[in-house]
């Protein structure tokens, strides 16, 4: 649905990244829309091998998103994924040793890290669409992360998804949100919705 919506709105997509590919649902939907440059990261070895077989024409990296080269910063048109969540810390020295306290905090929980690192990888005007736990928007301790994200991105949409959305697929009921951001590093003010 994300890829179809972007195509319907004439969003030019040349370069797509899925930072936590899993079974490749986003890869498939964007490839079907004619996106030529598709890169995916999948940390699990077996899942990554399967992805390479399913999508031989795409760049599949069997490693964690934290290993994406710095030269890839500011280069992707679209980044979309159903990202992992939890208090798992990420080993990324550029974050844990950063002077930016939001980056330091982001390295302490995987979902916050994916948001911050994802926006680093977007070109100006690029779109990030992540399905994530409700903790990103709900948790008071994530306030510095939300502020950092809103400082450098426009909030396109934030949708609270039904708790049973993944019941049939993954056998779990978890509160999830779809958050869509557009990179805007020159942003001067927050909208009323972004201040919430």
Specify the residue positions occupied by each region the protein language model found:
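Glycine-rich, phosphate-binding/catalytic loops in enzymes
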Residues: 34, 57, 95-99, 145-148
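Short, solvent-exposed polar/charged micro-motifs at secondary-structure junctions
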Residues: 69-72, 167-171
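Flexible, glycine-/basic-rich loop-and-beta segments that form/coincide
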Residues: 168-196
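Conserved Class I SAM-dependent methyltransferase catalytic core
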Residues: 43-45, 106-167, 176-180
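Conserved nucleotide-binding/hydrolysis micro-motifs of P-loop NTPases
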Residues: 85-86, 135-137, 165, 185-187
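Short aromatic-enriched loop/helix-cap "lid" or pocket-rim segments at secondary-structure transitions
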Residues: 92-93, 142-143, 170-172
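Mobile active-site "lid"/loop adjacent to the S-adenosyl-L-methionine
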Residues: 84-113
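Conserved S-adenosyl-L-methionine
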Residues: 1-88, 132-135, 151, 179
């Amino acid at each position: 649905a994300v890829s179809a919506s972007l195509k319907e709105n004439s969003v030019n997509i040349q370069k797509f990244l899925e930072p936590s590919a899993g079974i490749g649902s986003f890869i498939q939907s964007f490839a079907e829309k004619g996106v030529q440059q598709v890169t995916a990261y999948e940390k699990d070895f077996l899942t990554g091998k399967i992805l390479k077989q399913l999508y031989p024409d795409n760049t599949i990296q069997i490693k964690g998103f934290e290993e994406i080269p710095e030269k890839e910063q500011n280069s992707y048109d679209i980044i979309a994924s159903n990202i992992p969540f939890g208090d798992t810390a990420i080993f990324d020295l550029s974050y844990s040793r950063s002077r930016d306290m939001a980056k330091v905090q982001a390295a302490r929980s995987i979902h916050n890290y994916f948001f911050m690192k994802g926006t680093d990888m977007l070109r100006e005007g690029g779109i990030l669409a992540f399905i994530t736990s409700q903790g990103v928007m709900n948790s008071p301790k994530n306030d510095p992360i939300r502020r950092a994200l809103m400082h450098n991105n426009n909030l396109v949409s934030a949708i609270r998804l039904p708790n049973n959305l993944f019941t049939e697929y993954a056998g779990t009921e978890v509160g999830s949100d779809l958050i869509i951001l557009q990179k805007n590093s020159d942003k001067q003010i927050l909208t009323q919705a972004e201040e919430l």
